[in-house]
Amino acid sequence: MSHYDCPCMEKCPLHYAMSLIGGKWKVQILCSVTNAGTIRYNALRGKLDGISNTVLASALRELERDGLILRREYLEVPAGVEYAPTEDCRRLLPILEQLSDWAEARMPADESTTKKEEPQ
């Protein structure tokens, strides 16, 4: 089937979902925020090797706008900002884990990553 015949070309829920979480950094940001529970901007940036301040700030604004993370400002000097996952974000994580499992099973052996053991 060519992409012109695809029934997903108009108002596709999957396309909408990918517009919310697509891009190079959004899934990594969501996973980092969710794993931390609550995290400050600089701590989050430290977990994302290679991301610029501009890209991180933009992605965080989009994720907040789309209801996937909460932003809390604290009136202190210097100003403090924390990010936390929303309930929608928490519901998304098992789906991302399934997608990761699917992708890992399809990856060539030299590109496959080993899942990190969670501390007990």
PLM features: residue spans?
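N-terminal helix-turn-helix DNA-binding core of bacterial DNA-binding proteins
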Residues: 8-55, 76, 82, 113
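Basic, amphipathic "hinge/linker" alpha-helix immediately C-terminal to the N-terminal HTH DNA-binding motif
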Residues: 75-99
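Long, low-complexity, charged/polar intrinsically disordered regions in eukaryotic proteins
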Residues: 1-4
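A short, conserved structural fragment
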Residues: 64-73
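Alpha-helical linker/hinge and terminal dimerization helices associated
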Residues: 66, 95-107
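Exposed, interaction-prone assembly regions rather than primary DNA-binding/catalytic cores
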Residues: 113-120
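Basic amphipathic alpha-helical segments that dock to polyanions
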Residues: 56, 60-63
